[in-house]
Structure formats: C-alpha cells, structure tokens
C-alpha cells in the first residue's frame, strides 16, 4: 500500500472516477485532558486504488512548553495530518477507545469536492491552525469541510442556532470530565463567565458525540429540492470493550488538596 502522504497527492485526480467512500469517524473518550471529549476524523476509501486514509485535525506536539495550560486557554497549534486507516485503528484499539463510522451519503461530485478541500487544507502552508477548544477544533473543522462540499444545503433535524439547549460550555465540560477532577479544575480556572451562558446546538457540536448525533438526523437537500439522509450507515468499527469508567483518574482531588492547606 502506498504511504499516506503519497495517497494524498493522488486523491483529487482519482476521486471522480474511482469507487470512493467517505465517512465521519467518532472516537470514544480517553483519560488525558485532550481526549476527554472524544475525537473526530474523516476516513477516505478508494477501493479501485487501494487507498484507505484518515484525515485527522487533531495532530499536536504534546511536548510543547506548557501544553496543558495553553490547551485549556485555547492557545495551542494543531494541524491536519493524514495516516493510513490501519495505523489509526490500531492506535485507538491499543488506547482502548472505540471508534464509530458514519458513511456519508454524498454524490460523486460531493466526494470529489470534499477530498479536494481536504487535500488543499493538507498543503504545508495550510495544515497548521490555532486550536480553540470550543470554536475551532478537531470536530468543527471536519463538519465545516463537509458542509462546504455539499451541493445544496445540509439541514439538521433541530434548530441549530436557537439558544434552546439549556446547557452551557461549562455544563458540557463537567459532563465529559466526570472522574477527572484535576482536568476539570484546570479548565474551570481558564474559562471566563461566558462559559456559563446557554449555547445553541451548533456550538455544542464542538463535542464529537453531539456532532455524531446531529449528523445521524441531518438531511442533504440538493438544488432541486430533493432530500436524502446525510448518513447512509453507522457502525462501530473499533470495539475494545472499554468504558469511560476505565479511564477515571485516581488519587487526591482538588478539594482534598485544598483542605490540607486549611
């Protein structure tokens, strides 16, 4: 099989004529601060050419100075990477994190456009971006590229912009950091009062699992007014048997630490 980098250079030319499948991958949460909310990537399969690659907007340098602090502040640089699916799946299996696949119900033209957008974004001068935990992350970037590729409009089942969820950024942070009190404590310290304001469903899509749910109920409406489901099929493709409880951190909590100082 050709390397992932070699595959990328051929994708734009072959997407229109070869048998292609494009899918959204949603990965279960892990135990590190940067993995508590899960992860999203785009899988590109070209059966004719034997290509099976994953576009991953979640690449970063964990050894960068003050990474955790800068991550919580939204001051880290991430980049788009491309890996072979086999390696991607093996890594998540090793980490004990399940992966779900939603096959996107795109036309050949839309697949071609999406691969062209991703390929352009993978150019060295374009691939690095300033990561923002809530507004510009590994979930929102794939969503935006998929929406750009659609020949028509993507209609979600719910009103995505009305502030009717009754939840805030901090609510979601606490939901997905349960059992990881030090990570929660650090992120709470870095968030301002705006984190307590109600958010709409579109903003909630910074969490990969929310985007997975909304994609399942979304429809593509083409320029002729014909509607079709965005997701043709959903399946779990990496099964590890792990649950969020397996990643709960142990030891002294922030409250216990504070009580020792009293």
Q: Where on the chain are the PLM-derived regions?
A:
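Activation targets extended, charge/polar-rich intrinsically disordered C-terminal tails
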Residues: 120-262
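A structural motif
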Residues: 106-119
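Second-shell loop/turn segments in exported
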Residues: 30-31, 97-105, 124-133
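Extracellular structured ligand-interaction cores
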Residues: 39, 52, 101-103, 139, ...
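Bacterial Sec-dependent N-terminal signal peptides
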Residues: 1-11
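Glycine-rich catalytic cores of cysteine/serine-nucleophile enzymes that process amide/ester linkages
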Residues: 18-97
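Internal catalytic domains of large membrane-associated glycosyltransferases
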Residues: 7, 14-17, 24, 116, ...
